[in-house]
């Protein structure tokens, strides 16, 4: 009975998180344990910005483990091959931290630019789908 209850709770949790029952079937199929680590919780920047002004890119990273971890956060603009920021971050267990970088748009042309944030996986981490986020910013005059 306990296993059925656990599967039901897992199903409901997956449904709430993913909007479908996909994860239960996927976990059964894999037959391996998912090991969480670090993640990009949110990433925020204006959808539109003026060329020549600095644009703040806010990233919240999280630690899904109960123990302290250190990872490297890198924020880039793949469109221009610019590195906006990169630094090591140490997070206490089950915690998050906000990091804000300033992107210099001086000399860029009008258009849409991709901004990408990535945290390096920590030892033993197998769930890396949440380690990367990106967004687009339209630069105008």
Question: What is each residue range found by the language model?
Answer:
Residues 23-141:
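Extracellular/luminal regions of secreted and cell-surface proteins that mediate adhesion/ECM remodeling
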Residues 1-5:
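Positively charged n-region of N-terminal signal peptides that target proteins for export
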Residues 9-18:
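Bacterial N-terminal signal peptides
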């Amino acid at each position: 009975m306990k296993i059925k209850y656990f599967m039901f709770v897992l199903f409901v949790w997956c449904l709430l998180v993913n909007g479908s029952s996909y994860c239960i079937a996927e976990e059964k199929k894999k037959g391996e344990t998912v090991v969480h680590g670090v993640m990009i919780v949110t990433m925020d920047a204006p959808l539109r910005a003026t060329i020549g002004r600095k644009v703040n890119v806010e990233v919240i990273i999280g630690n899904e483990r109960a123990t302290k971890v250190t990872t490297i956060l890198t924020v880039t603009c793949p469109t221009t091959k610019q590195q906006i920021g990169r630094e090591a971050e140490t997070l206490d267990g089950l915690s998050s931290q906000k990091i804000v970088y300033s992107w210099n748009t001086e000399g860029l042309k009008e258009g849409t630019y991709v901004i990408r944030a990535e945290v390096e996986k920590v030892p033993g981490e197998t769930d890396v789908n949440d380690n990367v986020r990106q967004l687009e910013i339209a630069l105008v005059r």
